[in-house]
Amino acid sequence: MDKLDQLVQQAAAEFAAAADGVQLEQAKARYLGKTGALTERLKGLGKLAAEERRVAGAEINRAKDAIEAALEARRQALREAVLVAQLAAEALDVTLPGRGAAQGGLHPVSRTLERIEALFRSIGFVVADGPEVETDWHNFTALNTPENHPARSMHDTFYLEGHEDVLLRTHTSPVQIRTMLDHVARYGDRESMPEIRVIVPGRVYRVDSDATHSPMFHQVEGLWVGESVSFADLKGVIADFLRKFFETEELQVRFRPSFFPFTEPSAEIDVAFMSGALKGRWLEIAGCGMVHPNVLRFGGIDPERYTGFAFGMGPDRLTMLRYGVNDLRLFFEGDLRFLSQFR
């Protein structure tokens, strides 16, 4: 069986010379395929006598086992070579400085909202919430805004297509109505209802977009209703809040007469800083006023017995003033170079 030994050595040499899996399979076919050299020898066993067939068959099987072992060894070597090449291509230079995980942080408007909530919670207010998709009744009618009011125009308000009485709320004031109605449903059977003291942070929508306006922006609504709530209470709450928010006792606050359909009397709130880049300039901050009797009635509250004040301010505007940002749109563009300054 010297020829079988030579065949095994020849196959092992061809397997070792195969540079890849394709060449290895081609070499395998020459020995173990249907017309391979070893397969042909197996086919010739039928021509031998029984005793010779037994001896020759054992030798051929031994040679086949040796060839298959050489084949599998080469396959494993090729797999390892591929892995080594892959690892070399993906190798990391452990001497290079590491890249740490980027530190995240709250959005500056989120920081402002949290600060506003904390300051008002400290004086007994609770945070309320309401839907951003509102009915015309909650957004306008119940807030004493008549049907012919310009704010109802499609030029100022986003209405839902196919639903003339459904819109994206233009302010957080509808939550005033929802809060009062819920309050009356809960405490209306009592001789005297507890006070309502809520703030309503949230997103609102108007048809507007420029450096100081966005079609989506934030607003914080405030409402205090009780048996003896006055405009003096409103002035005290707002002035105290603004000085704490801007962390200065030198802040000047003034209330300028204005008009809102849902408050009477109404005022615009302006502030003036005594130092810094904005020193001496009066800047509009918020709108406020005593809740209009009609709004109290729509909320199910007797205006002959209860009074209240409401205010609305823009956290986006407050954030711009607090951090010295000149373009409101920067807050919503998602530019990490800008946002990372507020970590």
Swiss-Prot record:
* Named cofactor requirement(s): Mg(2+)
User: Source organism's superkingdom?
Assistant: Bacteria
Family annotation (InterPro entries):
aa-tRNA-synth_II (IPR006195), aa-tRNA-synth_II/BPL/LPL (IPR045864), Phe-tRNA-synth_IIc_asu (IPR004529), Phe-tRNA_ligase_II_N (IPR004188), Phe_tRNA_ligase_alpha1_bac (IPR022911), Phenylalanyl-tRNA_Synthase (IPR002319), tRNA-bd_arm (IPR010978)
Instruction: Indicate the principal place this protein occupies in or around the cell.
Output: cytoplasm
EC numbers = 6.1.1.20
Which Gene3D superfamilies does UniProt cross-reference here? Bira Bifunctional Protein, Domain 2 (3.30.930.10)
Reactions that this protein is recorded to catalyse: tRNA(Phe) + L-phenylalanine + ATP = L-phenylalanyl-tRNA(Phe) + AMP + diphosphate + H(+)
Q: Which residues form the signal peptide?
A: none
Broad class of enzyme this protein falls into: ligase
Quote the cellular component terms of the Gene Ontology held in the record. cytoplasm
MF terms (GO), sorted A to Z: ATP binding; magnesium ion binding; phenylalanine-tRNA ligase activity; tRNA binding
Q: Mind listing the UniProt keywords for this protein, alphabetically?
A: Aminoacyl-tRNA synthetase, ATP-binding, Cytoplasm, Ligase, Magnesium, Metal-binding, Nucleotide-binding, Protein biosynthesis
Q: Which residues bind Mg(2+)?
A: E264
How does the cofactor attach, per the note?
Answer: Binds 2 magnesium ions per tetramer.
What GO biological process terms does the UniProt entry carry, in alphabetical order? phenylalanyl-tRNA aminoacylation
What are the subcellular locations of this protein? Cytoplasm
Q: Which NCBIfam families match?
A: pheS
Protein family per UniProt: Belongs to the class-II aminoacyl-tRNA synthetase family. Phe-tRNA synthetase alpha subunit type 1 subfamily.
Q: How the protein assembles, per its UniProt entry?
A: Tetramer of two alpha and two beta subunits.
Q: What is this protein called?
A: Phenylalanine--tRNA ligase alpha subunit
